[in-house]
C-alpha cells in the first residue's frame, strides 16, 4: 500500500455501501482518518433498497479495524446546510479536511422514455447538483 494519504483526513459521501464503502475502506487502509456520510434512508424515485444506518455502522466498524479514526453522519448531499454542519464539525474534531471523495449518487434504471421529470430532477439533484454543492462549499 502507498502512503499518499497517510495522516490525511478524507471525506467520503455515499460511504455506507458499494463504491463509497470501498473508497472509504481503502483510504483507511492507506492511513487516512475518515469522515463518512450517507443518507441512510429511502430516496425519491429510487426503486432499489437504499443504504441503512446499519450499513453505515458497519462501514465505521471496518474502518476502526484499520486503527484509523472515523466520524460518521447521515445526510442527504442535496441538503447543503446539514452536510456543511456535519462535515465542519467532523473536520474540527479530526483537525482538518484534506481529501473529498464526492461519491454519493443514485441510479434509476429505466429507459429514457420512461424517465419522468421527477425522476430526472431527483437524479440530477443527487448526482450532479449535490456533488457540485459539496465541492463548492469545501472550496469556500
Task: Give the residues covered by each predicted segment.
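Substrate-binding pocket helix/loop in short-chain dehydrogenase/reductase
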Residues: 63, 111-112, 116-124
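A glycine-rich helix->loop->beta "capping" turn
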Residues: 66-69, 89-100, 108, 119
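Conserved glycine-rich Rossmann-like NAD(P)H-binding loop of the short-chain dehydrogenase/reductase
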Residues: 32-58
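The beta1-alpha1 cofactor-binding region of Rossmann-like NAD(H)/NADP(H)-dependent oxidoreductases
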Residues: 53-57, 74-86, 117
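Canonical Rossmann dinucleotide-binding motif of NAD(H)/NADP(H)-dependent dehydrogenases/reductases
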Residues: 2-41
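A short, exposed helix-loop element centered on a Lys and neighboring polar residues
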Residues: 135-136
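Rossmann-fold cofactor-recognition segment
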Residues: 61-79
Amino acid at each position: 500500500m502507498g502512503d499518499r494519504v497517510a495522516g490525511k483526513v478524507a471525506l467520503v459521501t455515499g460511504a455506507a455501501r458499494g463504491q463509497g464503502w470501498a473508497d472509504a475502506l481503502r483510504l483507511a487502509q492507506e492511513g487516512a482518518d475518515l469522515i463518512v456520510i450517507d443518507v441512510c434512508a429511502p430516496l425519491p424515485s429510487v426503486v432499489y433498497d437504499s443504504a441503512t444506518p446499519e450499513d453505515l455502522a458497519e462501514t465505521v466498524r471496518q474502518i476502526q479495524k484499520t486503527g484509523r479514526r472515523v466520524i460518521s453522519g447521515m445526510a442527504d448531499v442535496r441538503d447543503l446546510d446539514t452536510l456543511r454542519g456535519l462535515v465542519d464539525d467532523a473536520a474540527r474534531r479530526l483537525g482538518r479536511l484534506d481529501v473529498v471523495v464526492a461519491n454519493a449518487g443514485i441510479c434509476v434504471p429505466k429507459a429514457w422514455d420512461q424517465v419522468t421529470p421527477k425522476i430526472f430532477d431527483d437524479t440530477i439533484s443527487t448526482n450532479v447538483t449535490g456533488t457540485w454543492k459539496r465541492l463548492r462549499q469545501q472550496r469556500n
